[in-house]
Structures are given as C-alpha cells and as structure tokens.
Amino acid sequence: MSFKREGDDWSQLNVLKKRRVGDLLASYIPEDEALMLRDGRFACAICPHRPVLDTLAMLTAHRAGKKHLSSLQLFYGKKPPGKGTEQNPRQHNELRREETTAEAPLLTQTRLITQSALHRAPHYNSCCRRKYRPEAPRPSVSRPPLPPPEVEPQGGKISREPEPEAGSQTKESATVSSPAPMSPTRRRALDHYLTLRSSGWIPDGRGRWIKDENVEFDSDEEEPPDLPLD
C-alpha cells in the first residue's frame, strides 16, 4: 500500500526511512541495489534507466524480471548464464527463491552485509604473500660453512700456508704507508707551483701561466717568475 508523506517533519521522515530499510532487509534486498526516495517510493539502483516503483511488492516483481537480472550480472561483473537458464528463466528464478527462503533470516542478513562490505572494500591481492616465502628457507643457507671440520687431516697444511701471506701483506702495507722521500728538485717545483697559485696565477692547460681576472696584481708583468735554480 503506497501513501504520501504530508508535511516536512524530519522525525516522521526518519521513522519512514527506518521502516523502509526494515522492509528491504525483510525481503532480502541489499541497500546498494535499491534506493528509497523522499516520497516513500523505491528506485532500482541496478538498472541503468532507474525505474521508480511505488511499493515493495512492485520492486520485488521488477527484480525477478529479465532486464533486471541482465543488468545485475553487468553490475557485479558476472558471466551470462548458460543456455538452459536462458531457455527456462522461470525455473532459474524459482530455484533462486527456494535457496533464499531455505536459509534463516539472520544468516541471509549477515551474508548480505558481508557481501556489501566486500564489494566496497578494495580487492585482496594474494600475490603479496609470495614475496615473503623465499625468506623462510634462508636460515638453511647458513649450513654450507659447516663442512670444513670434515677436512681435518689436511687442515694442518692448509692452516700453515696462509701465515707467510699475512706476513707479506703486512710488509706491503708498511711499504705503502711509508711515502717515498721527495727529491729537492721536485720539492722546489712544488713550492714554486704553490707560490704561483697563491699569488693569483693559474695554468691554462698548455704549460703556460695566465693571470686570474678576479685577482689584483701589484705589477704589470705578463709572465710569472721563473723557477729558482737553487
């Protein structure tokens, strides 16, 4: 029985909404598949043309139609039914109704709530667990270093051979750490290079010295002083 709501009392509207939601749950219709309008009528949220129905009985009759079932399959991304269901849609609908009526009301309500929650939640990717599986057998990789105790008879020869290598390494490190003595001519050339750089001369890459534009010189000489012989 359809009726119109008179006035703009929000408390009355809330009571009406609660009653309509209760009617939807009582007839096993998920809230995502039907919308309740402000005038008390229902609109199908599955069909693309959004049909508006006056009563809950008309909504249930609409949901049993072919157009609604096809749009329901497109909405949930299911494959179309086989030839047997296309030829006998009434039998398919009757079997579907028998399955829903055979279940208890509480079970069907919880099943619908879980289905709506799963559709809203992001899809679970089971491939994430495969990344952690190779890490489980890693402790067994540390077992190969254990076999050396089996080679005990030859261990004496093997353990004695690395000793001179360690001594040679220490000698090489000592020779590398001690720098070679610098000759007097090389020291004079290094001192001359440092004095030229500190006084504002820079090498041009061709073996010549030029003045730095950012440095002020006391004299107008275009050539740097020569390397002292002594």
Swiss-Prot record:
Pfam families: SCNM1_acidic (PF15805), zf-SCNM1 (PF15803). GO terms for molecular function: zinc ion binding. Residues 89-100 have a biased composition (Basic and acidic residues). It is found in: Nucleus, Nucleoplasm; Nucleus speckle. One of its GO terms (biological process) is alternative mRNA splicing, via spliceosome. Residues 76-106, 129-191 are annotated as: Disordered. GO terms for cellular component: nuclear speck; nucleus; spliceosomal complex. The modification Phosphoserine is found at residues 2, 183, 219. There is a cross-link at residue 67 (Glycyl lysine isopeptide (Lys-Gly) (interchain with G-Cter in SUMO2)). Residues 188-230 are annotated as: Required for interaction with LUC7L2. The keyword Transmembrane helix does not apply. A zinc finger (Matrin-type) spans 42-74. Keywords: Isopeptide bond, Metal-binding, mRNA processing, mRNA splicing, Nucleus, Phosphoprotein, Spliceosome, Ubl conjugation, Zinc, Zinc-finger. Residues 167-180 have a biased composition (Polar residues). Residues 142-151 have a biased composition (Pro residues). It comes from the Eukaryota. As a component of the minor spliceosome, involved in the splicing of U12-type introns in pre-mRNAs. Plays a role in the regulation of primary cilia length and Hedgehog signaling. Component of the minor spliceosome. Within this complex, interacts with RNF113A, as well as with SF3B1/SF3b155, SF3B2/SF3b145, SF3B3/SF3b130 and CDC5L. May interact with LUC7L2 and SNRNP70. This is Sodium channel modifier 1. The lineage of its organism: Eukaryota, Metazoa, Chordata, Craniata, Vertebrata. The gene is SCNM1.
